[in-house]
Amino acid sequence: MSITFGELVGNFILVTGSVIVLLLLIKKFAWGAIESILQTRSQQISRDIDQAEQSRLSAQQLEAKSQANLDASRSQASKIISDAKEIGQLQGDKLVAEATDEAKRLKEKALTDIEQSKSDAISAVKTEMSDLMVLLAEKIMGANLDKTAQSQLIDSYLDDLGEA
């Protein structure tokens, strides 16, 4: 089977003519539909790209807003913690000051009570001494003793006083 040059040229002309006829038929009957489908698809892709871009921008705005809210919340939480620490410190200082004042007041009251007790004891001792002195003077006067006897009597009463 050998193909001659004439057959080859004939086949070429036939195939080329068939392709041209096919292209003319496609242009006449199908090209409008194909072009419409391609145009519709192009518009759909363009809309999808625009929607994706809008969604991306919306997501960025939402992210920025969320970040701002998060930052504000962190700032507010820090302020609340700071205020709580400050209030706690003030209350602690107040309690310490009140406790110190109460301790001073109790100490002063105790010192006052001690001074009063001391004063009462001294007063009682003075009263007791004066009573003993009066009693001693009465005994001395009633006993008409000489100086040695008076001295012994005074020493005896002072010893009794020391034991009391």
Curated annotation (Swiss-Prot):
GO cellular component terms, semicolon-separated: plasma membrane; proton-transporting ATP synthase complex
Membrane association type: Single-pass membrane protein
Source superkingdom: Bacteria
Cystine bridges: none
Transmembrane segments: 6-26
Family designation: Belongs to the ATPase B chain family.
Protein name per Swiss-Prot or TrEMBL: ATP synthase subunit b
